[in-house]
């Protein structure tokens, strides 16, 4: 069985894959020059718009932050950065795998693509663990529900992903062939076996382990929520039914967006080290390219999940009074013209002080209370 650099010898008929770098099989993948620019372009526009709106709510409308809102804020940041990394890839694939920019920019774009993808996965995991503790250990979750703990966890997540993705800057490079410059998604032939080993470690640490944690958390929560409460007669309360539906939706979105992408990418990389037929490799390569847009779509679906699953957050964002002018966030929002005028706020406060106090008391979470997603 041939392995290593020998696999890059020889040619067959077909269309060259920009990531293959002289690989012995030439894959038929003209479809990706339409699919990837179109899908990445849509994700870029929607992802930036939706996550920018979410960030505005977090920064300019919410007065009280806890662990849940902190994780959601960082999730929105990672999704927005992910969407912002797509325009150059749209241009690259629309030009037929031609990269007219520098090698350093190629490394940076690929690095940002995967860094923010895995940050999104880990922040979804943090939200799931936090919700699980709130359902299974509500008293203990009060201690860990403060924003200061969540900020430490968020910093650890960013540090972990940046450290794990740093080797990608070494592997990824560009090559010039036939007047075309390719920004590779893998590595040079002599480093490919090391790149596959690195990718498998990243798969285990940044996808498989978080996915297993999410499955366990939601299984435990579903079991607790489906348990009939003492003294109730038949059927689940409406709140519990909604929570169970939310669990199913989050799991479905996570599995739809991330699972196919990681499975096909792992098979694609692994099969290239084996002496398989080019037809088999072409099929798995096609599947891998098709699942790329699914992984990207998660940055558009996360903001929708915030508002579909968290009606309290929507009500809080709609009704809460903006922060006072003393806060840096409020000052920034005022400079951008995003806050209501001071005179309007003053008049509204004078005319409805009692009703405003009553409404704020109703919607502001108590200390340690979680905004459930």
Swiss-Prot record:
Signal peptide range: none
Disulfide bond entries: 106-183
Main location: membrane
Positions with biased composition (Basic and acidic residues): 342-373
Membrane association type: Multi-pass membrane protein
Single GO BP term: G protein-coupled receptor signaling pathway
Transmembrane regions: 40-60, 71-91, 109-129, 153-173, 200-220, 244-264
Stretch list, region Disordered: 320-373
Induction: Up-regulated in stented coronary arteries (at protein level).
Keywords: Cell membrane, Disulfide bond, G-protein coupled receptor, Membrane, Receptor, Transducer, Transmembrane, Transmembrane helix
Family to which this protein belongs: Belongs to the G-protein coupled receptor 1 family.
Function statement: Receptor for ATP and UTP coupled to G-proteins that activate a phosphatidylinositol-calcium second messenger system. The affinity range is UTP > ATP.
Protein name (record): P2Y purinoceptor 2
Species assigned in the record: Sus scrofa
């Amino acid at each position: 069985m041939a392995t290593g650099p020998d696999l890059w010898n020889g040619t067959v008929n077909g269309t060259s894959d920009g990531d293959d770098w002289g690989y012995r099989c030439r894959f038929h993948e003209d479809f990706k020059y339409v699919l990837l620019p179109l899908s990445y372009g849509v994700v870029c526009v929607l992802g930036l718009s939706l996550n920018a709106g979410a960030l505005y709510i977090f920064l300019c409308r919410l007065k009280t932050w806890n662990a849940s809102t902190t994780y959601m804020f960082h999730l929105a940041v990672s999704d927005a950065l992910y969407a912002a990394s797509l325009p150059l890839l749209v241009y690259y694939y629309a030009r037929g795998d031609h990269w007219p920019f520098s090698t350093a920019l190629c490394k940076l774009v690929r690095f940002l693509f995967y860094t923010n993808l895995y940050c999104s996965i880990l922040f979804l995991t943090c939200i799931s663990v936090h919700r699980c503790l709130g359902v299974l250990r509500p008293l203990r979750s009060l201690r860990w529900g403060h924003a200061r703990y969540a900020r430490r966890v968020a910093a650890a997540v960013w540090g972990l992903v940046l450290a794990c993705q740093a080797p990608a800057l070494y592997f990824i490079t560009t090559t010039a062939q036939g007047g075309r410059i390719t920004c590779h998604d893998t590595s040079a032939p002599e480093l490919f076996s090391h790149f596959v080993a690195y990718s498998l470690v990243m798969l285990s640490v940044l996808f498989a382990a978080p996915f297993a944690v999410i499955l366990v958390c939601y299984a435990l929560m579903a079991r607790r929520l489906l348990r009939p409460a003492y003294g109730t007669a038949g059927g689940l309360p409406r709140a519990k039914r909604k929570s169970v539906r939310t669990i199913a939706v989050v799991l479905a979105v996570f599995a739809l967006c991330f699972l196919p992408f990681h499975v096909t990418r792992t098979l694609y990389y692994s099969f290239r080290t084996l002496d398989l037929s080019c037809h088999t490799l072409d099929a798995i390569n096609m599947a891998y390219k098709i699942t790329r847009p699914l992984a990207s779509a998660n940055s558009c679906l996360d903001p929708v999940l915030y508002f579909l699953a968290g009606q309290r957050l929507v009500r809080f964002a709609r009704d809460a009074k903006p922060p006072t002018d003393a806060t840096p966030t409020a000052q920034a929002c005022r400079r951008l013209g995003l806050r209501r005028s001071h005179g309007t706020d003053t008049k509204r406060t004078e005319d409805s002080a009692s009703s405003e106090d009553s409404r704020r008391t109703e919607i502001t979470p108590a200390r340690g209370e979680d905004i459930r997603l």
